[in-house]
Regions:
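N-terminal pre-domain/capping segments
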Residues: 1-94, 252-297
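Histidine-acidic metal/acid-base catalytic patches
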Residues: 1-2, 11-22, 155-169, 179-297
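Hydrophobic faces of well-ordered beta-strands that scaffold small-molecule active sites
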Residues: 1-7, 29-31, 54-59, 97-99, ...
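Acidic-and-aromatic substrate-binding clefts and catalytic sites of carbohydrate-active enzymes
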Residues: 8-14, 30-42, 66-67, 105-108, ...
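Acidic (Asp/Glu)-rich catalytic clusters
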Residues: 16-23, 38-58, 87-94, 125-134, ...
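Noncatalytic linker/hinge segments flanking ATPase motor cores
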Residues: 41-50, 70-77, 94-103, 136-145, ...
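Active-site acidic/histidine proton-transfer and metal-coordination neighborhood
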Residues: 49, 72-170, 182, 259-267, ...
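Short connector loops/turns at beta-strand edges and beta->alpha or beta->beta junctions
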Residues: 59-62, 102-104, 194-195
């Protein structure tokens, strides 16, 4: 296992992200799935400069990106977006595309359960078959009930894997989400077994590992027991304290205006209210490394 980090939590030049992460002991990234923002040759050069790799690419499911959409054109466009991420992953030598099937924050169904399931299975299968040709694995990530209504636990993902019936399909296990949804998170992790293709690092409160109540030594021990050898991708995103206790947000959040495209900004607001300050974000990354690195050496 090795220490990795997502890049979507703080929109900034990739070199800034890589320089910070590499200095703290991270050896790879899970790149935000925005092909227009990251060009293969430039990204490869930066990864080489900081002696890092791209472990995975993750779908950023905002706007109209949704495999369960009623509109077939919308579903087709979503599949196309996900295939572009497969191309990005293959071009960067990444092993995994982490796939969230539906728009994050979509909490009300628009069609029958039977139709939604059929559409999601079809979309996931098409993406997975395409990824298999590129020697990339696809890891489906279940989210908690406050971010989605459709795929929220391990059993649902395992059923989706069975129904799609493509060998390169697995699960991206995030203990922040599964601590909410699973009655026994460790048992759920064991049940996944060798289908764990990716693992995210976030506390029960979505702070950094070590700043909540999850038992990280036991979690890492369990990952070893099931044979997981991949990336452990930091994905903490604390809510902004917008009260006087947090300086009305100023202790955690960059001053506005933020130079961020509308879609990314909305995604960040939905998760944490805004753009995290550089020094605050660095402390989050450092805390995660401080907690996890001694457990995997």
């Amino acid at each position: 296992m090795h220490l990795s980090t997502h890049t979507w939590m703080r929109p900034e030049p990739l070199e800034v992200t890589l320089k910070r992460a590499s200095s703290l002991g991270y050896t790879s990234i899970e790149l935000a799935g925005e092909p227009s923002r990251y060009h293969i040759n430039e990204t490869q050069a930066l990864l080489k400069k900081y002696d890092m790799t791209c472990w995975a690419v993750v779908t950023i499911m905002y706007g109209t990106r949704d495999l369960s959409a009623v509109d077939p054109n919308q579903r087709e466009a979503t599949v196309g977006y996900m295939k572009n991420l497969v191309d990005m992953a293959a071009g960067l030598g990444a092993e995994v595309v982490t796939l969230v099937p539906c728009t994050v924050g979509k909490l009300q169904p628009k069609a029958s359960p039977q139709d939604e399931w059929k559409w999601v299975v079809q979309g996931v299968r098409e993406v997975a078959l395409y990824a298999a040709e590129k020697k990339v694995r696809v890891a489906i990530e279940p989210l908690n009930r406050f971010e989605t209504y459709l795929i929220t636990n391990v059993s649902q993902v395992l059923r989706l894997i069975d129904d799609a019936n493509v060998p390169n399909l697995g699960i991206a296990f995030d203990p922040f989400h599964m601590n909410i949804e699973e009655p026994d998170m460790i048992a759920a992790l064991r049940r996944c077994g060798d289908k764990v293709f990716d693992f995210h690092l976030g506390e029960n409160n979505r702070l950094s590992p070590g700043d909540g109540n999850l038992d990280w030594p036991f979690i890492i021990k369990t990952l070893r027991e099931i044979g997981y050898k991949g990336g452990l991708a930091f994905e903490a995103m604390p809510p902004i304290d917008r009260t006087p206790n947090g300086g009305f947000g100023s202790l955690q959040m960059e001053d506005e205006p933020w130079n961020v495209d509308e879609g990314t900004l909305q995604f960040l607001k939905d998760h944490a209210s805004g753009v995290l300050r550089d020094d605050f974000y660095t402390k989050l990354l450092a805390r995660s490394a401080e907690t996890i690195l001694p457990l995997i050496k």
